[in-house]
Amino acid sequence: MVFIGPPASAKTLFLLGILDMIKDGVYFDGSNTTNRILDVLEEERPKIICIDELDKMPRTFQNQLLNFMESGRVKVDQQKKQYDFEIKGAKIFVTCNEIHRLSKPLQSRFRKLFLPRYTEEKFLDVSEKVLPKLSSSLARYIGVLYGRMGVP
């Protein structure tokens, strides 16, 4: 599944919620993840793979992901290491701001869920729920400050 939407539309919260419910999973931040992804996948062989901001990852990685989704196998030759392993039955959840940055074949492998931009009031409600250890008024205040930065 791919969660698509503007910044601050709770895409990452969905991924983290999935990982919280299903413990056999890994999370990668596509905006600053390195080749360590392949090492982690090879070592852990997770049943759930969550990639935040897949649209910011290089096209070469997106192509490798497509091959993996089609075959369940990772086969990559890099300068320093070769990878050749299987992960059968893994479920993949990703987020992206701009779906057009993914190739059409990769897009076709995902169910798409479009998340709209929050209204300011909804954003404040979410802030109170996401920051439950804080008092409701402090969580709401943080949401207001964040909103003034132009995020919601």
Model regions and ranges:
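Conserved nucleotide-binding/hydrolysis micro-motifs of P-loop NTPases
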Residues: 7-9, 32-34, 55-57, 92, ...
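Conserved AAA+ ATPase core "coupling" helix
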Residues: 88, 102-135
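Conserved AAA+ ATPase small/helical "lid" subdomain
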Residues: 135-152
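Walker A/P-loop
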Residues: 1-27
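AAA+/SF3 P-loop NTPase mechanochemical coupling elements
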Residues: 41-45, 76-95
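Short glycine-rich substrate-engagement loop in P-loop NTPases that contacts/grips substrate
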Residues: 22-48
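Conserved RecA-like P-loop NTPase ATPase core
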Residues: 3, 12, 18, 37-38, ...
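Conserved AAA+/SF3 P-loop NTPase catalytic/coupling segment centered on the Walker-B
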Residues: 14-17, 45-72, 99-109
